[in-house]
């Protein structure tokens, strides 16, 4: 049976969490005191919120952490009845561990309705002796102020490139293979600060039997940087038909969607040597194209319009 690497290599202690030194130091101080407040972990996907909560539970409860930590996903449990019944029933039960409390980890808490959050606030107050809540969310602004004021808020940033690279090298060494420099660059690029995504892509390319930039971009649904560079160059220089031919190849032969291409263009433009003025205009054009495609417009028409816009941008002098 294939073991999922994101679980196999999940941190077992707070010291193994990369890139969150300030948050980790705070959590370690809570562990030393054997007491934690309610917590709110805020940050984008793959920044280590769940891993940090589990590592905290392991350090507090040791081998019995699974019996003393309840994980729930608020996107599946977002109704007020769930708060009034299921979560309340869990919170009221006093655990048998020496610390006298358990952890209830509520992932995607920003998916809870405001009404459900208000009910949850009351549950937090009543059962704070037996249950410590850890909320995880992408957007702290979607958490009502009464809950924010009752938690210690910790913000998780995208994982720095060097930490992603280090973790992937550790996994490769443990699994008995090597990652060349170009492939590592591609892995770091497509992960965009998301450690979970980086590990999943690494396992996918390893399982495919080919660890290469081409395979990485293929698996993730990214156009290769070479094709993107050629397409932008042709478009900006007014070579509409040539740019369109490259886009057609990405759609037909590479199997990419319009959104895949737009997001690949965005990733490339952000780090390219294009002039700042052109970069601003191109990113605005990409945002417009993405919005229209997401709203249901035809991919091909929107990509043609995007190429035309790039040609218009290129025709202007700085």
Swiss-Prot record:
Gene: rfcS
Signal sequence segment: none
Functional summary from the UniProt entry: Part of the RFC clamp loader complex which loads the PCNA sliding clamp onto DNA.
UniProt family annotation: Belongs to the activator 1 small subunits family. RfcS subfamily.
Annotated protein name in UniProt: Replication factor C small subunit
Gene Ontology biological process: DNA repair; DNA-templated DNA replication
GO cellular component labels: DNA replication factor C complex
Organism of provenance: Thermoplasma acidophilum (strain ATCC 25905 / DSM 1728 / JCM 9062 / NBRC 15155 / AMRC-C165)
GO molecular function, one term: DNA clamp loader activity
Annotated S-S bridges: none
Top-rank taxon: Archaea
Binding residues for ATP: 43-50
Assembly information from the UniProt record: Heteromultimer composed of small subunits (RfcS) and large subunits (RfcL).
Key words of the record: ATP-binding, DNA replication, Nucleotide-binding
């Amino acid at each position: 049976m294939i073991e999922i690497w994101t679980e196999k290599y999940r941190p077992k202690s707070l010291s193994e969490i990369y890139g969150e030194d300030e948050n980790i130091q705070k959590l370690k101080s809570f562990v030393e005191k054997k007491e934690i407040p309610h917590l709110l972990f805020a940050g984008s996907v793959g920044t280590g919120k769940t891993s940090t909560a589990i590592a905290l539970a392991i350090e507090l409860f040791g081998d019995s952490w699974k019996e003393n930590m309840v994980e729930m996903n608020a996107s599946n449990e977002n109704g007020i009845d769930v708060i009034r019944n299921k979560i309340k029933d869990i919170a009221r039960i006093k655990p048998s561990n020496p610390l006298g409390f358990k952890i209830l980890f509520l992932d995607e808490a920003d998916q809870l309705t405001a009404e459900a959050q208000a009910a949850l606030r009351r549950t937090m107050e009543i059962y704070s002796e037996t249950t410590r809540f850890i909320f995880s969310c992408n957007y702290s602004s979607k958490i009502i102020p009464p809950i924010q004021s009752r938690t210690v808020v910790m913000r998780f940033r995208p994982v720095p490139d060097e930490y992603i690279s280090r973790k992937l090298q550790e996994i490769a060494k443990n699994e008995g293979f090597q990652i060349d420099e170009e492939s590592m660059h591609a892995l770091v690029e497509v992960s965009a600060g998301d450690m979970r995504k980086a590990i999943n892509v690494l396992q996918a390319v390893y399982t495919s039997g080919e660890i290469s930039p081409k395979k990485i971009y293929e698996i993730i649904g990214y156009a290769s940087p070479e094709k993107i560079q050629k397409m932008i160059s042709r478009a900006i220089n007014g070579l509409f038909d040539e740019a369109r031919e490259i886009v057609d190849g990405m759609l037909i032969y590479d199997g990419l969607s319009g959104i895949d291409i737009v997001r690949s263009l965005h990733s490339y433009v952000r780090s390219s040597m294009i002039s700042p003025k052109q970069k601003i205009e191109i990113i605005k054009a990409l945002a417009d194209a993405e919005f229209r495609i997401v709203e249901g417009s035809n991919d091909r028409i929107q990509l043609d319009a995007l190429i035309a816009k790039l040609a218009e941008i290129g025709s202007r002098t700085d």
